[in-house]
C-alpha cells in the first residue's frame, strides 16, 4: 500500500502518468490478461488424466498477446515438456503438431468452445469437451 501511495504522490508531483503506468496499473491490467488467457488453458476439459492432450488446450494468440503471455499459449506442449523454455515452445509445437488436437485460433476460437461447455457443465458436471486426438 505504501508503494502505491508513494507512486500516486510521485505521479502528482512530477505531473506524469508514467509512475502509475509502470508500478500500480500493471497489477490491474496484468491480472486481467492472466485471467483471460489462463481460462483458455483447461476450462471444459477432462481433469486428472495422464495424457495432457485431454486436459489442456493450446490457443494461437497474436504476436502481442503471445509476447505478453510468454508464449504460453502452447500450453499442451508446456505440460508435456515442462523443461522447454517458453521461447522454444513454438518450435516444439511445429515438431509435434501432427500428434496434437487442433490448435484453437485466438481467444475467440477458444471461448467459442469454452462458454458452451461451461453452460453444459453447469447442468451436467460430468460433461467434458470431446477432443479429436490423433492416434
Can you say where each PLM-predicted feature lies in the sequence?
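Histidine-centered catalytic micro-motifs
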Residues: 37-44, 68-84
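Short, exposed beta-strand "edge-strand" segments with a Pro/Gly-rich flavor and a Y/T-containing core
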Residues: 55-60, 78-82, 100-107
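Non-catalytic, topology-defining segments of multipass membrane proteins
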Residues: 1-20, 86-135
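Residue-level signal for short amphipathic helical patches enriched in basic/charged
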Residues: 31, 84-87
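Hydrophobic transmembrane alpha-helical segments that form the core helix bundle
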Residues: 1-62, 66, 126-135
Amino acid at each position: 500500500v505504501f508503494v502505491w501511495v508513494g507512486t500516486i504522490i510521485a505521479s502528482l508531483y512530477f505531473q506524469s502518468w508514467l509512475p502509475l503506468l509502470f508500478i500500480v496499473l500493471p497489477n490491474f491490467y496484468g491480472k486481467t490478461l492472466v485471467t483471460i488467457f489462463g481460462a483458455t488453458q483447461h476450462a471444459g476439459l477432462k481433469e486428472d488424466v495422464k495424457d495432457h492432450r485431454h486436459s489442456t488446450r493450446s490457443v494461437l494468440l497474436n504476436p502481442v498477446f503471445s509476447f505478453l503471455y510468454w508464449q504460453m499459449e502452447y500450453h499442451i506442449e508446456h505440460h508435456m515438456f515442462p523443461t522447454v523454455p517458453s521461447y522454444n515452445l513454438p518450435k516444439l509445437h511445429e515438431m509435434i503438431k501432427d500428434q496434437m488436437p487442433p490448435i484453437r485460433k485466438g481467444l475467440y476460437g477458444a471461448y467459442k468452445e469454452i462458454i458452451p461447455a461451461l453452460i453444459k457443465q453447469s447442468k451436467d458436471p460430468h460433461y467434458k469437451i470431446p477432443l479429436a486426438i490423433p492416434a
